[in-house]
């Protein structure tokens, strides 16, 4: 069944996007030699926390990594009204990270697996090379 991403709100796209992005991070951490649950969780936060995702999407925009459609989807996710409150971060950072996740949800729904992998690998590289920080 094909779902029209344009009919979905940004929160729904972000919900899916969160599930799409995280397996790339988990696989990367396992392949990097982390095997203990506490270490895996600790290191994952450098890639998947709201602060990290906000920093990554801001860098994507600065470096013009995103397509115009992806930028539009990001803005839709960022501007979506959420009834959940941010844990461990401020509302602005949380909303920006929601936009980040919405991009991955959009790419999944439009069956752009290669683009998902490309952006996920780009994000991993940025974090691994210290270009972004999960601390803001």
From Swiss-Prot:
Active site: 18
Cofactor(s) listed in the protein's UniProt record: Mg(2+)
Family membership: Belongs to the MrnC RNase family.
PANTHER family: MINI-RIBONUCLEASE 3
GO aspect biological process, one term: rRNA processing
Enzyme Commission numbers on file: 3.1.26.-
Subunit structure comment from the entry: Homodimer.
SUPFAM superfamilies, sorted: RNase III domain-like
Entry's Gene Ontology molecular function annotations: ribonuclease III activity; rRNA binding
Predominant subcellular localization, coarse grouping: cytoplasm
Organism this protein belongs to: Lactiplantibacillus plantarum (strain ATCC BAA-793 / NCIMB 8826 / WCFS1)
Compartments where located: Cytoplasm
Cited function: Involved in correct processing of both the 5' and 3' ends of 23S rRNA precursor. Processes 30S rRNA precursor transcript even in absence of ribonuclease 3 (Rnc); Rnc processes 30S rRNA into smaller rRNA precursors.
GO CC, alphabetical: cytoplasm
Record InterPro entries: Mini3_fam, RNase_III_dom, RNase_III_sf
Protein name: Mini-ribonuclease 3
Gene: mrnC
Record key words, sorted: Cytoplasm, Endonuclease, Hydrolase, Magnesium, Nuclease, Ribosome biogenesis, RNA-binding, rRNA processing, rRNA-binding
Domain of life of the organism encoding this protein: Bacteria
Disulfide pairings: none
């Amino acid at each position: 069944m094909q779902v029209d991403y344009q009919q979905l709100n940004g929160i729904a796209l972000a919900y899916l996007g969160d599930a799409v992005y995280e397996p790339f991070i988990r696989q990367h951490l396992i392949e990097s030699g982390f095997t203990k649950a506490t270490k895996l969780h600790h290191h994952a936060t450098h890639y998947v926390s709201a602060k990290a995702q906000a920093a990554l999407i801001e860098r994507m925009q600065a470096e013009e990594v995103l397509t115009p459609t992806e930028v539009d989807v990001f803005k839709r996710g960022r501007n979506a009204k959420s009834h959940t409150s941010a844990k461990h971060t401020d509302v602005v950072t949380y909303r920006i990270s929601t936009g980040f996740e919405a991009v991955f949800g959009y790419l999944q729904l439009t069956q752009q697996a290669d683009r998902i992998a490309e952006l996920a690998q780009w994000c991993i590289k940025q974090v691994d090379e210290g270009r972004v920080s999960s601390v803001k």
